[in-house]
Curated annotation (Swiss-Prot):
The lineage of its organism: Eukaryota, Metazoa, Spiralia, Lophotrochozoa, Mollusca. Its main location: secreted. Residues 20-50 form a propeptide. The keyword Secreted applies. Keywords: Amidation, Cleavage on pair of basic residues, Disulfide bond, Hydroxylation, Neurotoxin, Secreted, Signal, Toxin. Belongs to the conotoxin M superfamily. The modification 4-hydroxyproline is found at P62. This is Conotoxin tx3c. Disulfide bonds join C53-C64, C54-C60, C57-C63.
Length: 65
């Protein structure tokens, strides 16, 4: 009986982990799309590349962060 319980426990653990669907919206699942979504401060419309700072401090990390 003990061997049957151990075997049943192992099978339930293995197959239950495989049956759980992965969430496709996670960034780790979509590395190519993560590279396309560049939201860095250089793309901020208020960023001044000459000063390497923002004209306004709202939402720009080099000056205000």
């Amino acid at each position: 009986m003990f061997k049957l319980g151990v075997l049943l426990t192992i099978c339930l653990l293995l197959f239950s982990l495989n049956a759980v669907p992965l969430d496709g919206d996670q960034p780790a699942d979509q590395p190519a799309e993560r590279l396309l979504d560049d939201i860095s401060f250089e793309n901020n419309p208020f960023y001044d590349p000459a000063k390497r700072c923002c004209r306004t401090c709202f939402g720009c990390t080099p000056c205000c962060g």
